Swiss-Prot record:
Gene Ontology CC entries for this record: plasma membrane
Catalyses which reaction(s): ATP + protein L-histidine = ADP + protein N-phospho-L-histidine
Modified residues (Phosphohistidine): H492
Stated name of the protein: Autoinducer 2 sensor kinase/phosphatase LuxQ
Amino acid sequence: MTTTRSNIKKRRSLATLITKIIILVLAPIILGIFIQSYYFSKQIIWQEVDRTKQQTSALIHNIFDSHFAAIQIHHDSNSKSEVIRDFYTDRDTDVLNFFFLSIDQSDPSHTPEFRFLTDHKGIIWDDGNAHFYGVNDLILDSLANRVSFSNNWYYINVMTSIGSRHMLVRRVPILDPSTGEVLGFSFNAVVLDNNFALMEKLKSESNVDNVVLVANSVPLANSLIGDEPYNVADVLQRKSSDKRLDKLLVIETPIVVNAVTTELCLLTVQDNQSVVTLQIQHILAMLASIIGMIMIALMSREWIESKVSAQLESLMSYTRSAREEKGFERFGGSDIEEFDHIGSTLESTFEELEAQKKSFRDLFNFALSPIMVWSEESVLIQMNPAARKELVIEDDHEIMHPVFQGFKEKLTPHLKMAAQGATLTGVNVPIGNKIYRWNLSPIRVDGDISGIIVQGQDITTLIEAEKQSNIARREAEKSAQARADFLAKMSHEIRTPINGILGVAQLLKDSVDTQEQKNQIDVLCHSGEHLLAVLNDILDFSKIEQGKFNIQKHPFSFTDTMRTLENIYRPICTNKGVELVIENELDPNVEIFTDQVRLNQILFNLVSNAVKFTPIGSIRLHAELEQFYGAENSVLVVELTDTGIGIESDKLDQMFEPFVQEESTTTREYGGSGLGLTIVKNLVDMLEGDVQVRSSKGGGTTFVITLPVKDRERVLRPLEVSQRIKPEALFDESLKVLLVEDNHTNAFILQAFCKKYKMQVDWAKDGLDAMELLSDTTYDLILMDNQLPHLGGIETTHEIRQNLRLGTPIYACTADTAKETSDAFMAAGANYVMLKPIKENALHEAFVDFKQRFLVERT
């Protein structure tokens, strides 16, 4: 009972503790808020004072400028007077004096201190006022010489007979309107020293208390009348101290004349008492608030002492009973709503904890997977029934069983690692003939490791399935590689005869005369091109399956791509009677950054499909670039719509499957390998884009391609050499060419093509023959085949560069479409790689490249 009373008495001191918290925690925070408020208020006051300074400075300078602008306007107007011009001829001084007297009487506020006129020889007239300021004729001549150009105001400090005088001087030319001759110059001068009228004007119009004009901190003029509680010296002292919260606010305004900052400065004086009073009131308000907070803290202590402590002690007694585990009790309630809520919540929490303890025990005991707890010294502490069953342990006396000892020996190294703090997952340790995958995790209590929990899973079946999967995967990889090797070999074997077919067909075009023969040759060319396209589709699909398709992004003009596509397919559509509409909304001066080759392949496949399956009607291709604010990439959207045969909506999902067309009759009627759309879908995925399709039977088809791209302003490049130059006119002289080709047909075609360019061609049937010819003869160009007997094309190229040390340009020709082959040729020293079958246009492009890179450098 004594202990309880002692505890209650101790808990009642919480009121004092809370009061201390209020004072030691809340009070500094509130005090900080007050200080911050004072600081910000002071900053606001300072900013307001600074703003007042800026506004007053700008206003006083504007008034100063406007005053001299008015004098300038009068000066310009007077200089055009006929009276002044007549003076230069008749020298009638009385008329001129009367003229200026009348002007001064009409507007005395904008009258200069003195005036004088000059001609090309010197001063011819002055109004006599200059002598009142100590300015004699010599000084007037000096002023005329110093203000010798433009018609702006000039600040001048001169030493006169009565001391230094600071003045603004301006001149304007006197022109003869009939001849435009400059008769002379009119000068106006405003003396700033003791210019009380100017000071009064600035004071009254700027609404300040007083104005002082200084030059290099020396006062020149002021508006003080003598009854102020300060003098000019006080104004200068406050200007240098810059006390923003002083009773007297002095604002300094440098005078800029003709865009040049002068030594002149205007000091304006304003009463700042209201700002100082506001600051004092704010400080007093802060002190009153602090006193109020102290009183509130003391009153809060008394209230807490009487109302809160007893209720809190009841709540603490309930928590102590739960901690001592003397049995679960119900909370008796509290008069304070918050304490009652806390007690009820604790009651629910204790119930949940008790239920969780039971759940954890059940989870541990009834789990089907073995679970064990080990000490950091690798001593078994506890295991669940599933672990006992697998380890053949019925009670703790059977831990010497061989199965358990073998398991412990293999698990111990991992237990030691976990005891160092490591968490291990996926550790395979068998129990008998079964393989278990174990996870080991250290149990941390207050930062120290108190044990290790080990959980296992039987993966015997999974391991066996993984072995079978690996065997099947290796077999599939072998099969895929064999198919790839077969396709690569067939590519070379098929391209070689296609090269002969297309080459001879292109040569025949130039030798036949009748239209019928030309049509027959066109059929031959189109058939060969179709066969080549089917072969390319099959090879591309094979590369996609093997993941050998490379994406190489670079900037290019999408408008050029659309123009090329239109040039190719518009004649085809015209001959077929199908309307081709191309709408390109991209700016011609914008380049996009993506893989140009793959994008071309996507567009050409889609347009080719549309042309193929649209017997009548139209094909519409629309492209636009969608840009989003803040996004790194833009989105290229290409929509292709045709009025072709379409496809059933339930078969749209099959469109992108390889070797699939809607009906077998479609292949017979329209042709195709069924790979075009498969390649399109895979290329779009590789470019991180999306393709959507809408179609109905007989209602046409719409494809929508969206690709993320980067765009930028197009850099204009110099025009390349035209590819329309006739072959015989491309080279200025006959070139000597070495052709290395083992196939007679290919050699015949290439020789025929080269003759059109007036080339002298030597033919070597393999690499060894080529090496012999190069040892004895100098050539301008080498055309190198890939698969050669005895010594391959890549090896021959390497020998020419490394052993013969020849720099002769080597242009390789290969039927192998693999990028690795092209890279190997370039690494061996080739300068250019062409793909068979060699077309006349492709060969022409290669020769144009050769001329630009090597013949231009040679000249």
